[in-house]
Design a protein with these regions (language model features):
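Short linear capping/connector segments at secondary-structure termini
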Residues: 86-94, 124-130
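Conserved beta-strand positions that form and line the central face of beta-propeller blades
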Residues: 22, 34, 86, 97, ...
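Tryptophan-centric aromatic hotspots in well-structured domains and transmembrane helices
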Residues: 32, 57, 110-113, 149
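Hydrophobic face of amphipathic alpha-helices that form TPR/SEL1-like repeat modules
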Residues: 1-28
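Long amphipathic alpha-helix in the N-terminal Rossmann-like dinucleotide-binding domain
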Residues: 48, 70-80, 93-120
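N-terminal alpha-helical segment of soluble enzymes
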Residues: 10, 26-91
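Conserved small-residue-rich beta-alpha loop and adjacent elements
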Residues: 123-153
Length: 153
C-alpha cells in the first residue's frame, strides 16, 4: 500500500510520530494508501522551514513569483490524468467531474494569481495637502491556512 509522506523543507519525510492513518476510497470503502498522522513537531518543522525560505522568497520579484505560479500550473496540466485519477479516488467522485472541474480549476486558480500579482498596485492618498498616506503590499512573513474546502489547491 502506498505510504504518503510529509513534504517539509524540500524533502519527503515520515511524520515524527511514525504513525499513519488509512486513506479510504469512499466509492468502495477500502483503504488505498496511508497518510501521515502528523503532530505539533511536524507542524513546527514545517513552520521553521517556511520561515527559513521566507528570507529568499521576500526578495523575489513579482515576475519571478508569477513565473513560479505558472510553472506549478504547467505541472498540474502535464500531470492531468494522474491528478484526475487521484482526485477521483480520494473523494469518490466521478472521473468526469474531476477532469471537467477540479483539476482544471486548480491550474486556473494558480494562473489567475500569477496574473494578479503582476497587476497589484499601491495606493496613495493626499491628506489636506499636509501629508500623504500610502499603502505598500509586500510579503510580511509565514502564514498558515487550514481550509475546509474540497477542491484541490
Amino acid at each position: 500500500m502506498e505510504k504518503i509522506l510529509n513534504y517539509i523543507n524540500g524533502e519527503l519525510i515520515e511524520p515524527s510520530s511514525k504513525i499513519y492513518i488509512e486513506n479510504i476510497d469512499p466509492s468502495c470503502g477500502k483503504a488505498y494508501s496511508l497518510v501521515p498522522d502528523s503532530c505539533a513537531d511536524d507542524v513546527n518543522e514545517a513552520v521553521k522551514s517556511a520561515k527559513a525560505a521566507y528570507s529568499f522568497w521576500r526578495k523575489t520579484t513579482k515576475q519571478e513569483r508569477s513565473d513560479i505560479l505558472n510553472k506549478l500550473a504547467d505541472a498540474i496540466e502535464e500531470n492531468f490524468d494522474m491528478l484526475v485519477a487521484a482526485e477521483s479516488r480520494d473523494n469518490g467522485k466521478p472521473l468526469s467531474l474531476a477532469a471537467k472541474v477540479d483539476i482544471p480549476r486548480a491550474s486556473a486558480n494558480l494562473r489567475f494569481f500569477a496574473g494578479a500579482i503582476l497587476h497589484d498596485s499601491s495606493d496613495v492618498h493626499e491628506m489636506d495637502g499636509e501629508a500623504i498616506n500610502y499603502t505598500l503590499r509586500v510579503p510580511i512573513g509565514v502564514a498558515a491556512c487550514i481550509s475546509p474546502w474540497n477542491l484541490p489547491l
